[in-house]
Curated annotation (Swiss-Prot):
The keyword Repressor does not apply. [4Fe-4S] cluster binds at C311, C314, C345, E352. This is 4-hydroxy-3-methylbut-2-en-1-yl diphosphate synthase (ferredoxin). Converts 2C-methyl-D-erythritol 2,4-cyclodiphosphate (ME-2,4cPP) into 1-hydroxy-2-methyl-2-(E)-butenyl 4-diphosphate, using ferredoxin I (PetF) as the reducing agent. Its cofactor is [4Fe-4S] cluster. It comes from Thermosynechococcus vestitus (strain NIES-2133 / IAM M-273 / BP-1).
Length: 402
């Protein structure tokens, strides 16, 4: 009789994402890179001169899990307002890691606001803004170097200020605002974005300043992904280990805005690239935070909520799966760190929920079975299922009141 050969012992496959090793960079009380959890950030949309409104907006974001908050600082008046915003947060709430967003010709603004925030974000394409010449056909090396020298002269005081205060800087490149000289030299490409960042990094390094985070954002996902991959490649070649801030700029709103952001951010995170993220939506900033945490949870990078496993439903399903999943979620959504499976029938139930802490499975009409891991604990009438699940979690000491 012919027999099948014994199966070769499979080598376990490590499924956890291996993150790129980066240097730790402080932003207030939060540290990004250096193996720290991927941090979540957003940006308020209030005018910074509205001090009361800005303080309230920062607090709203921080209270729902936004760990770093960015504020726009387009003028010296806005920069000075940040002192009052910071002080009010200290007095009425708590210190919040704050980032000042500085753009056009922002040297004086950046120097002023650096006194009051934890991190200054500059855009290399706009920090020293040269108005494009409409009839230009080329950039000579001399012209390129001349502007480079001006950039260094302008950037140096800010670098020294941040360095001496122990603060940090984000070199934030945007695909849509590359400097004219970069466009002429490298084109409207990921390479131009990377070289723009590297120019500023080299200036910072020459001044012994290494508290840097880098971002390369674009409104088109393929460009954003390519730019960040190339940035990592170039940094590896140059022996640099700066943390990366990920985001798809101008992603829009609604379902597609979330899909677009996830497509860019999650692709890179899955490759181990990225130390802090922002989902940019044309909605209230508070709407961005759950999307960020959802991405991190789905990839296994952070556990901040219940992980629900549920089948898509089919003809074998023995109860209204969508309705029951909703009830289970409403009863348990405030918990953290649990895996709960809701399965419609016995065919796929036990196997598909093998990694779950608790299972809710349809076995026969009108009844459901509750599982603790792989062990069936009890069978109860369907109407009592959710309450019985809650009692099981409580009995195991894993319940907290909402």
């Amino acid at each position: 009789m012919q027999t099948l050969p014994s199966p070769v012992q499979a080598t376990p496959t490590e499924t956890a994402i291996v993150r790129r090793k980066t240097r730790p960079v402080p932003i207030g009380s939060v540290v990004i890179g250096g193996g720290h959890p991927v941090a979540v950030q957003s940006m308020i949309n209030e005018d910074t001169l509205d001090i009361e409104g800005s303080v309230a907006a920062i607090r709203r974001l921080h209270e729902i899990g936004c760990e770093i908050v960015r504020v726009t600082v387009p003028s010296l008046a806005h920069a000075k307002a940040m002192e009052e915003i910071r002080d009010r947060l200290y007095k009425t709430y708590k210190p919040v890691p704050l980032v000042a967003d500085v753009h056009h010709n922002g040297m004086k603004i950046a120097l002023e606001v650096a006194k009051y925030v934890d991190n200054v974000r500059i855009n290399p394409g706009l920090y020293v803004f040269e108005k494009p010449k409409p009839n230009r056909t080329e950039y000579t090396q001399a012209e390129f170097d001349e502007i480079g020298a001006k950039i260094r002269e302008t950037l140096e005081p800010l670098v020294i200020s941040l360095r001496d205060q122990g603060k940090s800087m984000r070199i934030g490149v945007n695909h849509g605002s590359l400097a004219e000289r970069m466009l002429f030299t490298y084109g409207d490409t990921p390479e131009g974005m990377v070289e723009s960042a590297l120019e500023f990094i080299r200036i910072c390094e020459s001044l012994n300043f290494y508290n840097l985070e880098i971002s390369l954002k674009a409104s088109r996902v393929p460009v954003m992904i390519a730019a960040n991959r190339l940035m990592v490649k170039r940094m590896d070649e140059l022996g640099m280990d700066y943390p990366l801030h990920l985001g798809v700029t101008e992603a829009g709103d609604g379902e597609y805005g979330r899909i677009k952001s996830t497509a860019g951010i999650a692709t890179l995170l899955a490759e181990g690239i990225g130390d802090t993220i922002r989902v940019s939506l044309t909605e209230a900033p508070e709407k961005e935070i759950p999307v960020c945490y959802g991405i991190l949870q789905a990839l296994g990078l952070r556990r901040t909520m219940v992980e629900y496993v549920a089948c898509p439903s089919c003809g074998r399903t023995l109860f209204n799966l969508e309705e029951v999943l909703h009830k289970v979620r409403e009863a348990t959504k405030h918990l953290t760190g649990l895996n709960i499976a809701v399965m419609g029938c016995i065919v796929n139930g036990p196997g598909e929920m093998a990694d779950a802490d608790y299972g809710y499975v349809g076995k026969q009409p009108g009844y459901i079975s509750l599982y603790r891991g792989r062990e069936e604990v009890k069978k109860v009438p369907e109407a009592e299922g959710v309450a019985a699940l809650v009692e099981l979690i409580k009995a195991d000491g894993r319940w907290v009141d909402p």
